[in-house]
């Protein structure tokens, strides 16, 4: 009952290659059925996101078979994934899944979205009946591990992107961030990320000012903000408790004078200004004004660097949790293997006994002496039951296989007097 994991991710493959190997929602059901039809595969789950595509399987299946299937399904050249994939089995595969779900293998260490994506992959596989008892238990335990990692370590805490760091700073400065009015200058990717993070924090009043009104309108529609032209800046600044600027301008857009005027109109209610642009959008002299608090991307970067160090330490703590849970699952899996072996051995023994008993009863019915029949029955049964152990003993002796000899010796060794006393 081997667990296997094969895939590619942001560490091993380019965006272009990851896009070619990703499974769309429309492809997923057929892909799951196709994987299940591979020789040796008993259960399967496919995790496919923008940063990774991974196959998790239970069964006796080779990495080459899985790799060949993945390459063929997406109609890639036979060696397209040769140097870009990874393949784990057993404990390594279990540890990898738990690390992925906990955010330890993500592009941004500790990001929480991956857990939801793994859950969706598991649910999709359940709907296709490609999850059985083993993967069911593995994924449920993985979800518990990810929750424990999130609750007991700081791996998902502290900002590690400039956009999120800006919002985190605003949250610490403004106790009621939800009631603050925020002005975003610029309508690029960074400004949009800031807007998304603000929305997640409950901010409802967001203004977007951009040189081209159309682009401001497009972004405002996506994030639920109001769009303005940059020419309206002097009217917008007094309304803003928080200003976040991120444009591609080569010259400052916001000067000391404009903030001074805005503060007067605000009756000197404080303003937080965060300049994410390089070169700067906001004049450095703004810091000379009372009630104006200016932070630059360099200020945020030092916070981010410290937070990354904190997350890396938390990741090491998380790995301890994952290793413990991997061992627990693997021990359970091994116990199933031994139970299955015992069941097979008993079934085999009973089959042999039943065959000999059937012959013995037939001979007795034919009038043969029961004592002689039973003696032959006993002799034949012993021969059949000892044939394989005898062959193993001979082979072990010839090859000086001390381990096998010791194991076989335990089959008929009497318990020591010391051990029997302790019972």
From Swiss-Prot:
Q: Which GO terms describe its molecular function?
A: glutamyl-tRNA reductase activity; NADP binding
Keyword NADP in record: yes
Which catalytic residues are annotated?
Answer: 50 (nucleophile)
Q: Which reaction does it catalyse?
A: (S)-4-amino-5-oxopentanoate + tRNA(Glu) + NADP(+) = L-glutamyl-tRNA(Glu) + NADPH + H(+)
Can you tell me which residues bind substrate? 49-52, 106, 111-113, 117
What is one process in the GO biological process aspect for this record?
protoporphyrinogen IX biosynthetic process from glutamate
Could you tell me the keywords of this UniProt record? NADP, Oxidoreductase, Porphyrin biosynthesis
Pathway field of the UniProt record reads:
Porphyrin-containing compound metabolism; protoporphyrin-IX biosynthesis; 5-aminolevulinate from L-glutamyl-tRNA(Glu): step 1/2
Question: Which Pfam families does this entry report, sorted A to Z?
Answer: GlutR_dimer (PF00745), GlutR_N (PF05201), Shikimate_DH (PF01488)
Q: Which residues bind NADP(+)?
A: 186-191
Look up the domain of life of the source. Bacteria
Q: Does the keyword tRNA-binding apply?
A: no
Any idea of its EC number? 1.2.1.70
Q: Where is this site: Important for activity?
A: 96
Q: How does it assemble?
A: Homodimer.
Question: What does its UniProt record remark on the domains?
Answer: Possesses an unusual extended V-shaped dimeric structure with each monomer consisting of three distinct domains arranged along a curved 'spinal' alpha-helix. The N-terminal catalytic domain specifically recognizes the glutamate moiety of the substrate. The second domain is the NADPH-binding domain, and the third C-terminal domain is responsible for dimerization.
Could you say which protein family the record assigns here? Answer: Belongs to the glutamyl-tRNA reductase family.
User: What more does the entry say?
Assistant: During catalysis, the active site Cys acts as a nucleophile attacking the alpha-carbonyl group of tRNA-bound glutamate with the formation of a thioester intermediate between enzyme and glutamate, and the concomitant release of tRNA(Glu). The thioester intermediate is finally reduced by direct hydride transfer from NADPH, to form the product GSA.
> Which PANTHER family would you find in this protein's record?
GLUTAMYL-TRNA REDUCTASE
This molecule's function is given as:
Catalyzes the NADPH-dependent reduction of glutamyl-tRNA(Glu) to glutamate 1-semialdehyde (GSA).
List the protein's name.
Glutamyl-tRNA reductase
| Native source organism of the sequence | Idiomarina loihiensis (strain ATCC BAA-735 / DSM 15497 / L2-TR)
Gene name of this polypeptide: hemA
């Amino acid at each position: 009952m081997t667990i296997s994991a094969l895939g590619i991710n942001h560490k091993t493959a380019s965006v272009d290659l990851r896009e070619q190997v990703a499974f769309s929602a429309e492809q997923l059901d057929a892909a799951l059925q196709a994987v299940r039809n591979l020789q040796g595969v008993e259960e399967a789950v496919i995790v496919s996101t923008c940063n990774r595509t991974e196959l998790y399987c239970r069964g006796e299946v080779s990495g080459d078979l899985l790799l060949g299937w993945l390459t063929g399904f997406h109609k890639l050249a036979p060696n397209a994934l040769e140097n870009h994939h990874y393949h784990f089995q057993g404990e390594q595969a279990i540890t990898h899944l738990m690390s992925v779900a906990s955010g330890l293998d993500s592009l941004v260490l500790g990001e929480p979205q991956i857990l939801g994506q793994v859950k969706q992959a598991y649910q999709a596989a359940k709907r296709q009946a490609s999850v059985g008892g083993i993967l069911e238990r593995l994924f449920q335990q993985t979800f518990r591990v990810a929750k424990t990692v999130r609750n007991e370590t700081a791996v998902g805490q502290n900002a590690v992107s400039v956009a999120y760091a800006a919002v985190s700073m605003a949250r610490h400065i403004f106790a009621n961030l939800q009631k603050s009015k925020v002005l975003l200058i610029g309508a690029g990717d960074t400004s949009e990320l800031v807007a998304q993070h603000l929305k997640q924090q409950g901010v409802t009043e967001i203004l977007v000012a951009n040189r081209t009104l159309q682009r401001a309108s497009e972004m405002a529609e996506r994030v639920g903000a109001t769009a303005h032209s940059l020419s309206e800046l002097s009217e917008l600044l007094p309304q803003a408790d928080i200003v976040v600027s991120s444009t591609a301008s080569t010259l400052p857009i916001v000067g000391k004078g404009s903030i001074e005027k805005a503060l007067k109109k605000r009756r000197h209610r404080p303003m937080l200004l965060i300049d994410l642009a390089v070169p700067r959008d906001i004049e450095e002299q703004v810091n000379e004004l009372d009630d104006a608090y200016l932070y630059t991307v360099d200020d945020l970067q030092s916070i981010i660097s410290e937070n990354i160090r904190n997350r890396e330490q938390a990741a090491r703590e998380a790995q301890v949790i994952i290793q413990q849970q991997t061992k627990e699952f693997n021990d359970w899996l091994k116990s199933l293997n031994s139970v299955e072996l015992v069941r097979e051995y008993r079934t085999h023994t009973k089959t042999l006994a039943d065959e000999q008993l059937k012959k013995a009863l037939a001979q007795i019915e034919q009038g043969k002496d029961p004592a002689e029949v039973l003696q032959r029955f006993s002799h034949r049964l012993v021969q059949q039951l000892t044939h394989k152990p005898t062959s193993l003993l001979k082979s072990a002796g010839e090859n000086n296989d001390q381990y096998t000899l010791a194991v076989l010796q335990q089959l008929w060794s009497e318990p020591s007097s010391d051990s029997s006393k302790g019972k």
